Design a protein with these regions (language model features):
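Asp-box/BNR beta-propeller blade signature and adjacent active/binding-site loops
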Residues: 17-375
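Bacterial N-terminal signal peptides
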Residues: 5-14
Length: 375
């Protein structure tokens, strides 16, 4: 074998599908790579999935480019998409959807929503230089995701950084109300004290109203993830620096939120993903069940990636198990989509070694519905 061919094979292997340690291999969970890291595109993450009218799946995510601060939150990234014809096992047809514009630091954190009426909506955040201002953009597609057209802004040139971070989402409630959780403050993204709000729209996204703020100590409340119960009560999980996820509730479809409370689950400062479990009234929470460490720069590691389940609307939780638990890895920026069969596609940012920003892959865990029942 020639030396050149050997080097090519080594390079391909280095960025192939994720290698799952033996202790993480589970028959009910399959791990796939949606976008691998390369020299020119060192980081991809923060994904969102929706089903297209032709039953294919579309994923959107941000992809960083090499250059100054490449791979870091304030590097240059754009919004890309891929599609899957096999329920998330393989992803193809990469396409850039939203480019950076003049005055952007980057365009980040997209989310897709296909409404009950069949509309396909896309949001993405234009972060402006120095991380102290942003614009939240809304797009719509009338041709099954082949193209997206601007539908206006949820906010424009904010005073202080407003964002969704690694937990981007746009929800449609049972009533048809659109709901967008976000957080921010009056300063720089990396130094400001944060509150969480929700924007809500009852006219398909033409106009938006804002909820009351959700506040916590230290860096504040961040990266809200929302689930709706049958009685239309909402539950929100929150990223905090206080020892683990906190929870907040709304009984009026997101217009007002009660004071957040501890979840009883331990972890550092990292995002969560809260979802209703299909075929049950329960909710599940994906989070990093790490030891809280007040001396750690993020108050704990972002491993293991764990799932907990609650049968009483988040009052108590039991750990189902770990999705991944490599002690040298980092798993965060989570999103979960359920297929028509009830199986989960959990997207996550994968970095190994943890906290490196030179090689970050966008991966997905394909989780059989039975896994959540312990079988």
């Amino acid at each position: 074998m020639s030396r050149l061919l050997l080097l090519v094979l080594v390079a391909i292997t280095a960025f192939s599908a994720p290698t799952v340690p033996a202790f993480d291999q589970q028959p009910s969970i399959q791990h796939v790579t949606i976008e691998r890291a390369t020299k020119n595109t060192p980081r991809s993450d923060t994904a969102s999935i929706a089903q297209l009218p032709d039953d294919r799946l579309m994923v959107v995510y941000h992809k960083y480019e090499s250059g100054t601060r490449s791979g870091h939150d304030h590097g240059v990234c754009r919004i890309w998409s891929k599609v899957s014809e096999d329920d998330g096992k393989t992803w193809c047809h990469p396409r850039m959807l939203v480019d950076v514009a003049k005055g952007d630091m980057n365009v980040q954190a997209p989310a897709l929503l296909r409404t009950k009426a069949g509309a396909l909506l896309l949001i993405s955040l234009r972060a402006h230089p120095k991380g102290n201002s942003s614009t939240m953009c809304l797009f719509g597609s009338t041709n099954g995701g082949k193209s997206f057209s601007p539908r206006g802004f949820l906010w424009s040139r904010s005073n202080g950084q407003l964002l969704q971070g690694g937990t981007s989402s746009l929800l449609e409630l049972k009533s048809g109300r659109l709901l967008l959780p976000y957080h921010g403050g009056a300063g720089n993204q990396w130094k400001q004290k944060n509150s969480v709000w929700c924007l809500y729209s009852d006219d398909g996204g033409k106009s938006w109203q804002r909820s009351n703020p959700i506040d916590l100590s230290k860096r504040g409340a961040m990266e809200g993830s929302v689930a709706e119960f049958d009685n239309e009560t909402l539950l929100m999980s929150l990223r905090t620096q206080l020892g683990g996820p906190f929870l907040a509730r709304s009984v009026d479809a997101g217009r007002t939120w009660c004071k957040p409370v501890v979840s009883g689950l331990e972890g550092g400062e990292s995002g969560t993903c809260l979802r209703r479990l299909p075929g049950s009234g329960d909710v599940i929470l994906f989070f990093n069940n790490s030891k809280y460490n007040k001396d750690h720069h993020h108050f704990g590691e972002r491993t293991p990636l764990t799932c907990a389940r609650s049968a009483d609307q988040g009052k108590t939780w039991r750990i189902i198990g770990n999705i991944l638990a490599d002690p040298r890895a980092e798993y965060t920026n989570l999103d979960c989509f359920f297929t028509s069969q009830g199986d989960a596609i959990l997207t996550y940012m994968y970095a190994r070694p943890a906290w490196n920003r030179d090689r970050i892959q966008l991966n997905a865990a394909l989780i059989a519905r039975r896994w959540f029942d312990g079988s």
